Amino acid sequence: MAKRQLNRRQNWRIEKIQGERAARAAKREQHALQELEGGDLGPEQLGLVIAHFGVQVEVEAQDGETAGQVFRCHLRANLPALVTGDRVVWRAGNQGIGVIVAQMPRSTELCRPNNHGQLKPVAANVDLIVIVFAPAPEPHPNLIDRYLVAAEHAGLRPLLLLNKADLINDENGPGLHALLEVYRELGYPLLEVSAHHGDGMQRLQQQLDGHISVFVGQSGVGKSSLVNSLLPDAGTRVGDLSEWSGQGTHTTTTARLYHFPNGGDLIDSPGIREFGLGHVSRDDVEDGFIEFRDLFGTCRFRDCKHDREPGCALLKALEEGRIKPQRMNSYRSIIASLAEDSY
């Protein structure tokens, strides 16, 4: 059954109610923070944000007698938006509650625009982005390519991960193998695993050890199952595919950071069906298509749009098979989705 469309007045009323609730929550949080800061606070110490719950976060103490312990912390109003993976300075209060007083500089951040077009960080201080897809829901090359552009833009190393490899059959196998071959030819690291059967999980663990990684991908591709297989004590809830849509049901509601026994961390983020790139420029997108890089600037016309123009280096490469149609379609789709002012 299709979702009922809301009219403008209904949308306005929903936003108004949500805004009022958010304002009341913020007022309660500010009152709690004032009471906390009015009492005795411990010395400043370093911490790591391991989960975010709206107006509060969970912080793991990084030094001192409480190192390794987790505290629920309030946020001072003058702080920038914090995300899982942020390193912070915090002070402990009473009853296991603390206050974050400063954010440490980020080495990297993975961002995406929200529904209002405002840039929203997803995870901080990550160095490996694991792009997860599966035979079902059907993988979309455009979404994979959007993640690859985001990885290049953020300076993160990508790892393509096909989960549920045990579901490959005669029907979906040819298309999947053709999809994977495109990225293998480009030199992207790629693994095939099955979190359910354990196939390939040891090789995946070796790739993750020593890195701060984030799993991204559509809902339903098995990110939570991967976390449960890698970290059995994590207890991440697993969801099924929606019967009517074939899309995954969301299970992870907030990004959470987990530690690996041999070193390294994993951030499990909520499922993302559409990954916007409105915060990047045309140059950033072009840089994200690694096989296109040497071709840009070699077209006959300086303002070539790589559509039907004569003397286009990209169209020639496409005709000669040096660029795959799948990648060209993704490039055109992403460029078309950019805001006019990013050109």
Swiss-Prot record:
Q: Which InterPro entries match?
A: G_CP_dom (IPR030378), NA-bd_OB-fold (IPR012340), P-loop_NTPase (IPR027417), Ribosome_biogen_GTPase_RsgA (IPR004881), RsgA_GTPase_dom (IPR010914)
Q: Can you tell which superkingdom this protein's organism belongs to? A: Bacteria
Cellular component, GO, one term: cytoplasm
Q: Where do the CP-type G domain residues begin and end?
A: 116-275
Metal-binding recorded as keyword: yes
Question: What is the disulfide pattern of this chain?
Answer: none
What's its EC? 3.6.1.-
Q: Where is the signal peptide?
A: none
Annotated GO biological processes are: ribosomal small subunit biogenesis
Residues bound to GTP: 163-166, 217-225
For this chain's record, the cofactor binding note is: Binds 1 zinc ion per subunit.
Q: Which UniProt keywords apply?
A: Cytoplasm, GTP-binding, Hydrolase, Metal-binding, Nucleotide-binding, Ribosome biogenesis, RNA-binding, rRNA-binding, Zinc
One Pfam family linked to the record: RsgA_GTPase
Which compartments is it annotated to reside in? Cytoplasm
How is this protein organized at the quaternary level?
Monomer. Associates with 30S ribosomal subunit, binds 16S rRNA.
UniProt xrefs under HAMAP family: GTPase_RsgA (MF_01820)
Per the entry, what this protein does is: One of several proteins that assist in the late maturation steps of the functional core of the 30S ribosomal subunit. Helps release RbfA from mature subunits. May play a role in the assembly of ribosomal proteins into the subunit. Circularly permuted GTPase that catalyzes slow GTP hydrolysis, GTPase activity is stimulated by the 30S ribosomal subunit.
Q: What is this protein called?
A: Small ribosomal subunit biogenesis GTPase RsgA
Q: Provide the species name.
A: Pseudomonas putida (strain ATCC 47054 / DSM 6125 / CFBP 8728 / NCIMB 11950 / KT2440)
**Encoding gene (name):** rsgA
